[in-house]
Amino acid sequence: KKNGYAVDSSGKAPECLLSNYCNNECTKVHYADKGYCCLLSCYCFGLSDDKKVLDISDTRKKYCDYTIIN
């Protein structure tokens, strides 16, 4: 399993202002374990390895992996 910004068929990650919205997007649409809003896009945790994710810098990935809101 992996973490990242899950993308839709058009290659875009859902934009967000609320983490609650992202948790629903990530768990119900992308079947991840959980999700939250990181830097204005939905960041998902526990995505299956075959899911497409946005190509982002290591710095941004580390920031979002580290900034988990429980």
UniProtKB/Swiss-Prot annotation:
Disulfide bonds join C16-C37, C22-C42, C26-C44, C38-C64. Keywords: Disulfide bond, Ion channel impairing toxin, Neurotoxin, Secreted, Toxin, Voltage-gated sodium channel impairing toxin. Expressed by the venom gland. GO terms for cellular component: extracellular region. Residues 2-65 form the LCN-type CS-alpha/beta domain. PROSITE patterns: LCN_CSAB. It is found in: Secreted. GO terms for molecular function: sodium channel inhibitor activity; toxin activity. Excitatory insect beta-toxins induce a spastic paralysis. They bind voltage-independently at site-4 of sodium channels (Nav) and shift the voltage of activation toward more negative potentials thereby affecting sodium channel activation and promoting spontaneous and repetitive firing. This is Toxin Isom2. It comes from Isometrus vittatus (Bark scorpion).
